[in-house]
């Protein structure tokens, strides 16, 4: 299955892990999506989810200067997760930043409010510079 689908599953896993009362481990959260999705790139999903969780403070520090009158805590949970995922992938993979940004915009269109993709694109454009 495509990286695009794997990013969707990574997003959903991170969203699940962000729930207030979640005591799931990363491996437990990923195991829920393994059933019925044998074609996903679970190595990539684990890399992305673990990387975001392990580097969350650094990612937030990287993102924060570009939020313009916002704080990371005030962002919608969906936007915060998408920004963290894309920033981690831009900084720690060989995937072209343009591809990562386009995927982040598509995730935002799918999971966030109507025009938030513009905000996500703007923040990521500044990060990739």
Swiss-Prot record:
User: Which cellular component terms (GO) are annotated to the entry?
Assistant: cytosol
User: What are this entry's molecular-function GO terms?
Assistant: RNA binding
Q: Keywords of this protein's UniProt record, alphabetized?
A: RNA-binding, Transcription, Transcription antitermination, Transcription regulation
Q: Give an example GO biological process.
A: transcription antitermination
Tell me which stretches of the chain form a coiled coil. Answer: none
Give the residue spans that cross the bilayer. none
Write out the similarity annotation: Belongs to the NusB family.
HAMAP family in UniProt: NusB
Q: NCBIfam families, per this entry?
A: nusB (TIGR01951)
Q: What does this protein do?
A: Involved in transcription antitermination. Required for transcription of ribosomal RNA (rRNA) genes. Binds specifically to the boxA antiterminator sequence of the ribosomal RNA (rrn) operons.
- Protein name per Swiss-Prot or TrEMBL: Transcription antitermination protein NusB
Q: Which organism is it from?
A: Staphylococcus aureus (strain bovine RF122 / ET3-1)
Gene (UniProt): nusB
């Amino acid at each position: 299955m495509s990286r695009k689908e794997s990013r969707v599953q990574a997003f959903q896993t991170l969203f699940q892990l962000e729930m207030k009362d979640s005591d799931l481990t990363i491996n437990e959260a990923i195991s829920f999506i393994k059933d019925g999705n044998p074609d996903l790139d679970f190595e990539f999903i684990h890399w992305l989810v673990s990387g975001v969780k392990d580097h969350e403070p650094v990612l937030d520090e990287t993102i924060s200067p570009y939020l313009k009158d916002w704080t990371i805590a005030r962002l919608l949970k969906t936007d915060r997760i998408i920004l963290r995922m894309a920033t981690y992938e831009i900084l720690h993979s060989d995937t072209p930043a343009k591809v990562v940004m386009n995927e982040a915009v598509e995730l935002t269109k799918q999971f966030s409010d109507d025009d938030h993709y513009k905000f996500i694109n703007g923040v990521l454009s500044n990060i990739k510079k």
